[in-house]
C-alpha cells in the first residue's frame, strides 16, 4: 500500500512562486502635491543587484518600497511641523502679560495655567 506524504518544503516553495508583487496603489483622497522633479530614487538608494538564483524580486517591488520610504519622509516632515506649531502655541500661552488672565479664560471652569499643565512637553 503506497502512502503519499506531502513535502512541506516543496509546498512552501510553490506558495512563494505563486506570490505576486503588489500593484502600485491608486491615489489617496489625502493627495499630497509633490514637486514636478520628485523621484522616489532621490530619497532612497537601493542596491538593485540581487544575488543570482531564486529569490530575485521584480523591479516593481523596489518601486513600491521607494514610494513607501518617500511617504514616511513626508509624514515625518509633517509631524515635525506640527510639533513646532504646538511648541509655539505652548510658548505663547506661557508668556506673562500676554493679556490672558485666568478670569478671561474662554473655557468655563478652567484657567489658562491649568491648560498649560495639560499640554504635552515636546522635545526635539
From Swiss-Prot:
Subunit structure as annotated in this protein's UniProt entry: Interacts with HSP70. Associates with HSP90. Interacts with TSSK6; this interaction is direct and recruits TSACC to HSP90.
Tissue: In testis, expressed in the inner luminal layer of the seminiferous tubules.
Listed GO CC annotations: cytoplasm
Similarity comment: family membership: Belongs to the TSACC family.
One function term, GO molecular function aspect: protein kinase binding
Keyword presence, S-adenosyl-L-methionine: no
Tagged with keyword Chaperone: yes
Function (record text): Co-chaperone that facilitates HSP-mediated activation of TSSK6.
Protein name: TSSK6-activating co-chaperone protein
Naturally occurring in which organism (per UniProt): Mus musculus
Domain of life: Eukaryota
Keywords from the UniProt entry: Chaperone
UniProt xrefs under InterPro entries: SSTK-IP
